[in-house]
Amino acid sequence: DAVRSKLDQPLPLGYCNAGVILESDVEGFEPGDRVVSNGNHAEVVRVPKNLCVKIPDNVDDESASFTVLGAIGLQGIRLMQPTMGECFVVTGLGLIGLLCVQMLRANGCRVLGIDFDSKKCERAQKFGAETVDLSKGEDPVIVAQGFSRGRGVDGVLITAATQSDEVIHQSAEMCRKRGRIVLVGVVGLNLRRDDFFKKEITFQVSASYGPGRYDSFYEDEGNDYPIGFVRWTEQRNFEAVLDMMSSGMLDVKSVITHHFDIENAIDAYGLLDNPDALGIVLNYPSQSREVLTKSKVELNVQSTKDSDPSTPCVGFIGAGNYASRTLIPAFKEAGAVLDTLVTSGGISGVHHGNKNQFTTASTETKDLWNNDKVNTVSIVTRHDAHAQQVVDALKSGKNVFVEKPLALTLDELDVIDKTYHKANKSNTVRLMVGFNRRYAPHIVKMKEL
């Protein structure tokens, strides 16, 4: 059931977009600013400040939307530490590979591009690279020797996707002594020791778009790394890519092959296996601020309209694994009317709301506190959010079922105690904490021993 539940749940796609700020509570960004971010493909995204960068005035939104992809390639290039006049191989001339060709050329390097697709090789040539067309039987190692004037190339940037280990082997053969290999794509990694030992070749895997990636301290909490110690964070890589677009050193328009309105996104994803497809742009329609910023969606208007007033009418905060697989079904089976589901992400709220016949899906808890139909609130959120949500629910006169823990500190517990007794004087309310593990079969058995 757990596996089926996961497979059934929709996941937000994409991580490259450009748009206009609607709301901002951080310094440096104002409503109306044009920005790029790594937010998902959606009409509205909420993005941490370190993953968002303003777009220069002379860069159009369409080109800017490729900034994050450019930063993925740029981070791989930074790891190779190229210097002017060096020669590099780019293996795999897809979208990121072609962007890397341009950035290496802008850095004063000679570039040899390798691919099976003749058309992609032709594109790379237009950007100033020499190429190896594998579909014509050309040997990349022999060509690389000639390209490097018999010395071996200074480095190889792998932007290909294949299960074969041959890419790594050939990369090592192409390199000079102490050459560099950086993997941006995904290839087989059964390395041959001799390939690297004799030449002292370095091999490194590039992690996405730069320092800060996957670090909650940087991304979620918004703390920057000091520039004196980390010159190129992921945000500063975004800026560098946009600067190259602004100066004309990075031509994105030439790699855009298709445009789709978001209503036809399925057709766009159907092109991913098409060798002629490179840059695919999804366009969203212009909508009013009121439509874009609405916090709730009506799902099943009939579900509570004619319900018995004595029946528990429940609102849920949280739809994680335990809530969606265990608690919501348990309330539903017990005969409770499910009214409002509040989640931090709209996708999960609408999905689980429709699945369990909730009336409304929302991203704001105020839609529960101000809902007179809801008499009971179930809180299944992060532990540090429980106390304040319990207090708010009690103040609004709701019965509360909260998953353990009720609070994290004695001060929080004291506030809950006072709020509960005050609420109970004016309107009888119930507060219950769910210690669900006490009913686990093993715990029950242990108590019996």
Regions found by a protein language model. Give the residues of each.
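Beta-loop-alpha module in the N-terminal Rossmann-like domain of NAD(P)-dependent dehydrogenases
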Residues: I158-I168, T360-K418
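A contiguous active-site-proximal alpha/beta segment in oxidoreductase catalytic domains
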Residues: A407-L449
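C-terminal capping/lid region of NAD(P)-dependent oxidoreductase domains
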Residues: G146, G150, G155, V182-V186, ...
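Glycine-rich beta-strand-centered segment in the early N-terminal region that forms part
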Residues: D1-N40
